[in-house]
Amino acid sequence: MKILFAYKVNWGVFTMYDSIKEIVKDSMDSGKPISELIIEQECNLSGLPRHEVWDKMKRNLQTMRAAVKKGSEGEGVFSKTGLTGGEAVKIKEYRKKHRSLSGDSMMEAIQDAIATNEVNASMGIVCATPTAGSAGTLPGIIFMLENRLKLDEEQMVRFLFTAGGLGMVIANHAGIAGATGGCQAEVGSASAMGAAAAVEVAGGTAEQSSQALAMAIANLLGLVCDPIAGLVEVPCVKRNAIGAGNALLSADMALAGCVSVIPADECIEALDKVGHGLPETLRETGLGGLAGTPTGQAIRAKIFGDNA
């Protein structure tokens, strides 16, 4: 039996969105962007006035910015194990000296995504979006878009409301934990959230946000959670870069008019079913995938001892 964090109910004036389809319809009928619908929902859910709800989300944005800054300064940050760290700075220097194959905007997104998760791996402060293991995906997207689209703070906070509101639907119907659904549930969900939010700040419609979300999920469907030594470091840090890149590609395809053959809500349902179909070795146990390779097992033994 699946227990939802929240579900379709009516408590006086309060209604919790239960599907992407419902959000898109309300946006089209009301003329309001998804972000506005989610702000209204959050005010009703929390009982807080709008300015307090807004300020709380703004603090999330500030936390993200601080993590990106910390991970990109000096020589970077390093985890206690030494498995990860310093690679955001390497990308930063690469961007200065070379013409990247994927373009500077993409590399900026990758840098910020990796910087954030290197901070997480070094026991720093990040904003879980939707989890700490996938905390770099949204910062990777939003700060690149800030520079590329000249976003102001209001647009960036709205980006986070859109991402969070759609992420709630994913969480309620498929889950967001690697232990239950694999990395597709963490980085995959973050990528979908970011893709949809990117469409909105770029001037797209709610329907296009829905299409971007669906394509982002489909592109990462089946991604396993196989952290070496059970630590949120390898391959987790770099997978956030993939999540950011996938989100931007999915957003661009949606803005170009491309559509997902499978609707967003059905993609979320597939995400749930695939997650439950993954063996436990590929759901955050550190036993299968890359963690189960000879090198992965050797690293585990070195960190925790041969009998770990």
Where are these regions (language model features)?
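Generic N-terminal targeting/processing segments that precede catalytic cores or assembly contacts
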Residues: 2-124, 147-148, 257, 264-308
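Acidic-glycine-rich active-site phosphate/pyrophosphate-binding loop
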Residues: 103-120, 155-174, 219-227, 262
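Conserved phosphate/anionic-ligand binding catalytic regions in large, soluble enzymes, centered on
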Residues: 123-141, 185-190
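Active-site-adjacent structural elements in folded domains
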Residues: 123-126, 176-182, 234
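Alpha-helical support elements that line or immediately flank enzyme active sites
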Residues: 139-150, 195-203
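Glycine- and acidic-residue-rich phosphate-binding/metal-coordinating active-site segment common to enzymes
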Residues: 160, 166-179, 183-193, 198, ...
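Functionally critical mobile loop/hinge segments
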Residues: 200-308
